[in-house]
Amino acid sequence: MIKTLMGSIRDYMRVTVATPLLVLGEVLCEMLIPFITANLIDAIKDGATVAQMLPTAGFLVLIALTSLAFGAAAGVTCSHASCGFAKNLRHDLFYKIQTFSFANIDEFSSSSLVTRLTTDINNVQQAFMMLIRIAVRAPLVLVFAFAMAYAMGGSVAMVYLVIIPLLGFGLFFIIYKVRPIFARVFRKYDALNESVEENVTGMRVVKSYVREDFEKEKFATAARDVQMDFTRAEKLLAFNNPMMNICVNGAFVVIIYLGSKLIITSQGTLFDVGQLSSIFTYGFQILMSLMQLSMIFVMVTMADESAHRITEVLAAEPTIANPAEPVLEVADGSIDFDHVSFKYSAHAKRQALDDIDLHIKSGETIGIIGGTGSAKSTLVNLIARLYDATEGTVRVGGMDVRDYDLDALRHQVAMVLQKNVLFSGTIAENLRWGDPNATDEEVREAAHLACADEFVDGFPKGYDTWIEQGGSNVSGGQKQRLCIARALLRRPKILILDDSTSAVDTKTDAKIRAGLASYLPNTTKLIIAQRISSVQDADRIIVMEDGRIAQIGNHDELLKTSEIYRETFTSQNKMSAEGEGAVETDTEASATQAQTQEGGEAHE
């Protein structure tokens, strides 16, 4: 774990190493100050003049200023090192996540990854800052202060040697009890972040179902769980300072007693006031170093769990990776599933896809329908290698998808997923995800083919209109059309529309399909839909049921051979007819009402 985290120091290694060295200089200067002060006190007691004390006093000021300079420099280098380390660590973690497949994301969950990128890295940064400065300073002060106190006070200073093990034992016991609580707290932070993420992304649904109170209670419960565990930890940590103060103050009482007795009995020959004053000063330094050490232990205990969570992500191997010698060119848009089976987890009892044998020619338009949970989306996810088949082989352009460079493959397989996602930025910037070099004319053409220009041109800023995070300021249908336009700009060899026109009307749906056919005539198109009208013009239609291909054929063939397809077609036509009838009835009623009103007005 430490080796993994240290890899993120990189270009900040010089300031990281410089910080402890500067701290060492600061501590050495600080240790001299009580010693020089004791000499000044003795000189005053012996009746030295101001002129005689000036060199010693000047040296004391010089040492104090030097200590201040070392301390200030250590503070600057420590800040640079810790902030740079956190920046690199955040960079490494984020870049690692970019290599993850869907399976890796499913393993960690998005809310947990957000916590690791934010809260956990902040904790590790704070611990790193304390380790390179305070964790160096505190032990040095402790050792040097005790050594100087012993040199000046002999057996009187041995009192400190008794309290240090007592405090160490007490601190170890507290940390032993607190550590598992912090581990539990960070797991609950994930639940808290998940609650916030769900609420913010689903705000419209929350408000439409008047679920604000429920969401408030859910968030309050998650926040209360975090609070309760933190409170338990803080209650245990609260014993630390009182325990330390009791031990150190007790030591001071004993030192005053022993020191005073020694001064009186020896009449200042074996032990004097200057030495006693220095021992007290060193005692305060020992106290401060012990308090700093306890702070370090607490911070490191918190950061230890965060560090484990971070390294868990950094050490995770992407389930999907590039081969040693990848193929960089996709020949065409042909797709072959050779007896493919797939399950999301190795421990799953049933296959999500079971023995799929399917062969699609380049340039074909394939419709895919089936009930919820029939694995339609799972099937197409294997084409872009978002998941790897458990059994069998998926080939694109005649090559096993596992032999391709991932970027090369995915650049030729444009997917408009079931969950449409837009990013913060202008409409034009979002569309250029498909092709960063697309001209304004190409952007407008793609938007026109996806029927997105119908609403974009109505915005005051047109294609420069700002899209909020997740596309929250556009409707579901508008979002779908923008995502289709984005995919069109890529001009891929394979285009997959996963229920991507469900939020648009049938007329717009038909216009989009016509645009696809004219704009990408040689592109293989796979259209997943719930409406049969969206796929009935396809070259072939696949009917999925329980992870298997139940039937394949064109529209007319399936009406004869597939009961599922026929029933779906009949029920949708019936609903459509009833809807049209209702519209006609409403129209007639409106006309009758209008005639009645006109007659009444004429009569008046």
How does the language model describe each region?
Residues 2, 10, 21, 25, ...:
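Hydrophobic alpha-helical transmembrane segments of ABC transporter permease domains
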Residues 10, 16-73, 77, 150-155, ...:
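Transmembrane helix-loop-helix hairpins at lipid-water interfaces of multipass membrane proteins
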Residues 11, 99-103, 119-132, 136, ...:
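An intracellular "coupling" helix at the cytosolic face of ABC transporter transmembrane type-1 domains
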Residues 14-16, 22, 63-82, 133-140, ...:
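Alpha-helical transmembrane segments of multi-pass membrane proteins
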Residues 21-22, 29-42, 63-110, 114, ...:
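Juxtamembrane helix-loop junctions of ABC transporter transmembrane domains
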Residues 46-49, 53-58, 148-162, 171, ...:
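Helix-loop-helix
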Residues 93, 97, 206, 310, ...:
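Helix-loop junctions and hydrophobic alpha-helical segments within the transmembrane domains
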Residues 328-604:
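ABC-type nucleotide-binding domain
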